[in-house]
């Protein structure tokens, strides 16, 4: 059975009472996000009005979801915890390791062959420890979770940054690193800084070519990629009624690009219908019984500014189709502005490839509406200029879409149907091009468009739009085509216009599938043996990191001073490196290879202070490690933006990098660094970043007095003999300092179990 029905019955039986107790304790009305948070305290007796954005709180999530690229490291850590089974319901989803090449029929068998060792490992660990296993081809983690596991009022963590997708069905769903997931899997408290609350007030109704994707693309332009850090975005207002559950999931999904802890929509009739249409009638009924507490209190809705830390106003009737990019998802541009903005910024204006899919936009409704645009091109005799690639969100969606003729609509205009997997969105794309370094443009319905992310080409200008707009621009072959106003030529030379997209929210004949690709947890598999070959280059058992030696860090060489955006893609690249996600030593060879060196403007080329030669970042780090020397990384704002991959924290730790000193951090990555026993420090004065020189030896003092709220001192010894000193700060609490001293959170847990 897929649903953990007894857990859900127990949860809903006590949920409303938990909320009532919370309101009585804090003595005020509650937002919906607060209700869910307070209902999931690890120790309900500790309930009090926590200081948002300041205090850390222990929670007890209902479940854990893991994708195959991050599950490897998470489960390798779990295996060291000495548990017989997971403490909460959990699932593994094989979606990241499948490469998009020529089509699903060939790509999926090839992936099963290439990744057999990893799939066998994940399957055996799942069976042994009572974890649900979704095999390759079953679908993208967040679409599968929405269809099968998400439930209003619940709390979930997932080892993927787009876990907040489930907020579309009313969950507090948070992306975390593997070590955080292990806390939940082993029944320990899960620690989170009490989020700030950003209320997003939706009025009006979407129309024409505007979609839910355009709502979040517009919000990204307002708040930027840092604007949601340590915050939950809670949506409210009469505009909610016109947005489907999958549309709401799209909006919550890309809240990750704001840096938000998560995003959430209240339970409503659309959510109830989605639960029923996906075979969860009992959950819909249980939620309906608790409906009053699955939304913000009336007093909050009447006077939202008194309860939210910030309010964003969005009139849906004024939302335009957007095309965000290139290179960052918050470069928001209404499509009507592209004719002027494109040439002014020297964008390549020919859209060569359109990619529809990803966890953000691969629902039945997404495909149905996008197919309505493709169908027009075929029926109106319009020659399609670009290449179109489709990744369905799950096998249930693919099977149903094929039955209903949706996939045929795409195929008729030459589209390639790829596997139900992430594919190009995570860099798993064998792009067929003669020159993968040339300047070009692609349009996607994905969530991220960092340089090199999709195809490895630093000169690919990637833009993000809705599935409908992606198909329209692929048909036109131009980034400045506005389907609301512009016309195209048919094969006879006549001007024709594309009508606004249409499509069913749910399949008229219902969802259908022959094989979901799921293996349910079973007590019968407890004796399954988990084997890791000692000579494997894909999997490697983990050795504990060394504890702190009690000394200050003196004369550390600067490994790299990064310039500009440094995401987890820059720190630990995906694409071809995904195959090493279960082997820490091998994947560490990609450390910071995408980061730009502030001293030469180049990537993966830094000075090795031992011999003065310029080498790859990992080569320099390994040279220092071999000599027993700790090193330090210096960075700018929002370091670690993007994916939840904890490899971006484990790799520097493995290569003896002890400190990341940045202007600011992205939430998930800062936590991951702390979990691995590293020091994530920030400049008190951001201008001190400019004092760091290439040949500096850097000391960090004050560690013996390391305490919550304390300052540490950095001293730079420059090559000319001069020095600079300045204070740095941190956000560590007592527990996190204990992790540092123990060498990692896992070491601390093992020592204190």
Feature annotation, model-predicted:
Residues 76-80, 306-401, 405, 524-659:
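Non-catalytic terminal/interface segments that mediate subunit docking, oligomerization
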Residues 379-429, 643, 649, 662-681, ...:
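Extended C-terminal subregions enriched in glycine
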Residues 488-505, 670-739, 746-749:
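Acidic, glycine-rich flexible loop/linker segments
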Residues 3-4, 68, 151-284, 416, ...:
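Mobile "lid/hinge" segments at catalytic clefts and subdomain interfaces of large enzymes
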Residues 47, 147, 151, 243-249, ...:
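Short glycine/threonine-rich loop-to-helix capping motif typified by GTGT followed
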Residues 8-11, 15, 20-195, 581-633, ...:
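Long, structured ligand/cofactor-binding scaffold of large enzymes
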Residues 42, 46, 51-60, 74, ...:
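Terminal amphipathic helices with adjacent charged low-complexity linkers/tails
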């Amino acid at each position: 059975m897929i649903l953990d029905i007894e857990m859900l019955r127990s949860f809903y039986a006590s949920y409303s009472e938990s909320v009532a107790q919370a309101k009585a304790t804090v003595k005020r009305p509650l937002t919906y996000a607060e209700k869910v948070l307070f209902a999931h305290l690890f120790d309900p007796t500790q309930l009090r009005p926590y200081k948002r954005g300041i205090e850390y709180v222990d929670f007890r999530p209902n479940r854990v979801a893991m994708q195959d690229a991050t599950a490897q490291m998470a489960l390798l850590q779990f295996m060291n915890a000495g548990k017989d089974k997971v403490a909460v319901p959990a699932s593994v989803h094989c979606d990241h390791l499948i490469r998009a090449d020529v089509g699903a029929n060939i790509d999926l068998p090839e992936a099963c062959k290439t990744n057999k060792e990893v799939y066998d490992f994940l399957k055996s660990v799942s069976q042994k420890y009572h974890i649900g296993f979704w095999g390759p081809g079953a679908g993208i983690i967040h679409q599968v979770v929405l269809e099968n596991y998400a439930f209003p009022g619940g709390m979930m963590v997932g080892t993927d940054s787009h876990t907040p997708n489930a907020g579309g069905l009313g969950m507090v769903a948070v992306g975390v690193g593997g070590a955080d997931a292990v806390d939940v899997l082993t029944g320990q408290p899960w620690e989170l800084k009490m989020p700030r609350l950003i209320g997003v007030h939706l009025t009006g109704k979407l129309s024409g070519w505007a979609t839910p994707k355009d709502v979040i693309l517009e919000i990204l332009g307002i708040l930027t990629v840092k604007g949601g850090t340590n915050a939950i975005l809670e949506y409210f207002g009469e505009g909610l009624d016109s947005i489907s559950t999958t549309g709401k999931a799209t909006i919550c999904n890309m809240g990750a690009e704001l840096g938000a802890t998560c995003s959430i929509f209240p339970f409503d009739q659309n959510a109830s219908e989605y639960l029923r249409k996906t075979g969860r009638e009992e959950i819909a009924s249980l939620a309906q019984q608790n409906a009053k507490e699955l939304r913000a209190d009336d007093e909050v809705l009447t006077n939202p500014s008194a309860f939210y830390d910030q309010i964003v106003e969005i009139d849906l009737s004024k939302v335009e189709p957007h095309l965000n990019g290139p290179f960052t998802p918050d470069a928001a541009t209404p499509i009507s502005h592209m004719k002027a903005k494109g040439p002014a910024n020297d964008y390549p204006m020919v859209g060569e490839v359109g990619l529809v899919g990803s966890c953000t936009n691969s629902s039945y409704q997404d495909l149905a509406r996008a197919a309505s645009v493709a169908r027009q091109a075929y029926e109106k005799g319009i020659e399609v200029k670009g290449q179109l690639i489709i990744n369905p969100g799950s096998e249930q969606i693919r099977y149903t879409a094929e039955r209903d003729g949706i996939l045929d609509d795409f195929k008729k205009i030459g589209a390639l149907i790829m596997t139900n997997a992430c594919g190009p969105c995570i860099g798993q794309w064998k792009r067929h091009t003669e020159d993968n370094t040339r300047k070009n443009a692609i349009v996607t319905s994905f969530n991220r468009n960092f340089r090199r992310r999709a195809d490895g080409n630093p000169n690919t200008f990637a833009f993000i739009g809705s599935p409908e707009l992606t198909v329209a621009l692929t048909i036109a072959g131009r980034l400045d085509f506005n389907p609301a106003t512009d016309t195209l030529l048919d094969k006879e030379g006549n001007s024709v216009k594309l009508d606004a997209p249409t499509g069913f929210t749910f399949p008229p004949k219902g969802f259908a599938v022959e094989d979901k690709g799921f293996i349910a947890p079973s007590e019968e598999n407890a004796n399954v043996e988990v084997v890791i070959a000692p000579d494997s280059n894909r999997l490697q058992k983990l050795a504990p990191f060394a504890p702190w030696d009690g000394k200050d860090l003196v004369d550390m060489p600067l490994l790299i001073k990064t310039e500009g955006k440094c995401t987890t893609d820059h720190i630990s690249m995906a694409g071809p490196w995904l195959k090493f996600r279960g082997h820490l030593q091998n994947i560490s060879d990609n450390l910071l290879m995408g980061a730009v060196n502030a001293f030469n403007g180049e990537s993966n080329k830094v000075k090795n202070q031992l011999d003065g030669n310029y080498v790859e970042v990992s080569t320099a780090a390994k040279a220092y490690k071999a000599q027993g020397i700790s090193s330090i990384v210096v960075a700018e704002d929002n370091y670690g933006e993007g994916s939840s991959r904890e490899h971006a924290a484990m790799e520097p730790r493995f290569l003896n990098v002890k400190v990341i000193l940045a202007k600011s951090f992205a939430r998930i990555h800062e936590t991951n660094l702390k979990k691995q026993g590293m020091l994530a420090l920030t400049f008190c004065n951001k201008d001190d970043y400019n004092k760091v020189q290439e040949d500096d030896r850097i000391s960090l003092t004050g560690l013996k007095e390391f305490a919550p709220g304390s300052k540490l001192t950095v001293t730079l010894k420059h090559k000319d003999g001069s020095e600079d000193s300045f204070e740095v700060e941190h956000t560590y609490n007592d527990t996190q300092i204990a992790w540092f001293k123990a060498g990692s959170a896992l070491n601390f847990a093992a020592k204190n179990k």
